């Protein structure tokens, strides 16, 4: 049985670490009018009748896949996506980003490829990359790491934190295009270390290789979600489904649960990972399993929201909000997992 912790990532220890950091940093919040808790997707700072949304994230160990394939022109898209998709989750439209590239040794050609992806992601998201930092850190960094910090703006009266979520609301799931940028330590262990696949091996039931599926850039959700903002729908919550899978929904509101009973067919890459002795409970806790973003709204508003979304992406109602605080997911095998 292969788990995330066995692949070198201890989610529970990460949570304790983040908690200790946050408890110390909390003392600085008194200097500004902060709206969101530190555990939300993006922080909000009030400026009069508007708020700045800020979020920071990186590409993670997906970079190792880029190195295996000697292909660096898409990891910049991942960097942009991981930041802007989080900013959307508080109702804000992303507007700008700064990047951080840490390298073992400078490599101008690789940096140019990385920049191509950053530009592609920025143009698709309609944001400006206004600066950044490149640091040479031999002895600290192996190869390179890439991260970004983004900002967005939102009117204070249009902020979406999840506080309006209530039992009976419906979950609209927007499809992912694969793994996106989370769970790669588990994927690499299951597929390469344990099963012995290579990046050039063909995917079952697909015309692509395993490497091509793993390097596929993270979906950008700016256009469809901003389209919802402009229509001023009654949106109760927004969730970017990243590391932690559907347990990310707990970041929105305490005291509610979620019954996820109608997911689209899981992409083949997830089925291949599962076949390498990874438990279903672990799969749905680590990966997005085919849903990259969730919109939570009341039942009456759902159809109108989906009509707008379908101009940009594939979506469907995947579940509902409950009042028992559990998250239950019906898996592609027909069984249920509960968190």
From Swiss-Prot:
Enzyme class per UniProt: ligase
Keyword annotations: ATP-binding, Cytoplasm, Ligase, Nucleotide-binding, Purine biosynthesis
Entry GO CC: cytosol
Keyword Cytoplasm: yes
One record GO biological process: adenine biosynthetic process
GO function terms (MF aspect): ATP binding; phosphoribosylamine-glycine ligase activity; phosphoribosylformylglycinamidine cyclo-ligase activity
Entry EC no(s): 6.3.3.1
Stretches that traverse the bilayer: none
Catalytic activity: 2-formamido-N(1)-(5-O-phospho-beta-D-ribosyl)acetamidine + ATP = 5-amino-1-(5-phospho-beta-D-ribosyl)imidazole + ADP + phosphate + H(+)
Pathway(s) of this molecule: Purine metabolism; IMP biosynthesis via de novo pathway; 5-amino-1-(5-phospho-D-ribosyl)imidazole from N(2)-formyl-N(1)-(5-phospho-D-ribosyl)glycinamide: step 2/2
Family listed: Belongs to the AIR synthase family.
Protein name: Phosphoribosylformylglycinamidine cyclo-ligase
Organism: Methanobrevibacter smithii (strain ATCC 35061 / DSM 861 / OCM 144 / PS)
Underlying gene: purM
């Amino acid at each position: 049985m292969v788990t995330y912790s066995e692949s070198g990532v201890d989610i529970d220890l990460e949570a304790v670490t983040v908690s200790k950091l946050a408890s110390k940093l909390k003392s600085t919040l008194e200097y500004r009018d902060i709206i969101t808790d530190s555990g939300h997707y993006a922080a909000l700072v009030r400026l009069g009748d508007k708020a700045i949304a800020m979020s920071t994230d990186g590409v993670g160990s997906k970079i190792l896949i880029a190195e295996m394939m000697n292909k660096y022109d898409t990891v910049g898209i991942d960097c942009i996506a991981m930041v802007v998709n989080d900013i959307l989750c508080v109702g804000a439209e992303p507007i700008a980003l700064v990047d951080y590239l840490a390298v073992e040794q400078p490599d101008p050609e690789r940096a140019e490829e990385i920049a191509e992806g950053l530009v592609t992601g920025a143009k698709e998201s309609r944001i400006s990359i206004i600066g950044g930092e490149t640091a040479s850190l031999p002895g600290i960094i192996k190869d390179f790491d890439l991260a970004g910090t983004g900002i967005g703006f939102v009117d204070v009266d249009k902020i979406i934190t999840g506080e309006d979520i209530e039992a009976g609301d419906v979950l609209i799931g927007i499809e992912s295009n694969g793994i996106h940028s989370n769970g790669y330590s588990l994927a690499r262990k299951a597929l390469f270390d344990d099963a012995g696949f290579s990046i050039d091996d063909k995917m079952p039931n697909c015309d692509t290789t395993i490497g091509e599926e793993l390097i596929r850039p993270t979906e950008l959700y700016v256009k469809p979600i901003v389209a919802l903002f402009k229509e001023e729908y009654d949106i109760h919550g927004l969730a970017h489904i990243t590391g932690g899978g559907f347990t990310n929904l707990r970041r929105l509101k305490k005291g509610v649960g979620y019954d996820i009973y109608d997911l689209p067919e899981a992409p083949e890459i997830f089925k291949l990972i599962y076949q390498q002795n990874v438990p279903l409970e672990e799969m749905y806790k680590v990966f997005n399993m085919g849903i990259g973003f969730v919109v939570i709204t009341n039942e009456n508003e759902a159809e109108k929201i989906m009509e707008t979304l379908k101009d940009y992406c594939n979506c469907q109602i995947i579940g509902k909000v409950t009042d028992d605080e559990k998250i239950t997911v019906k898996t592609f095998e027909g069984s249920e997992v509960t968190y």
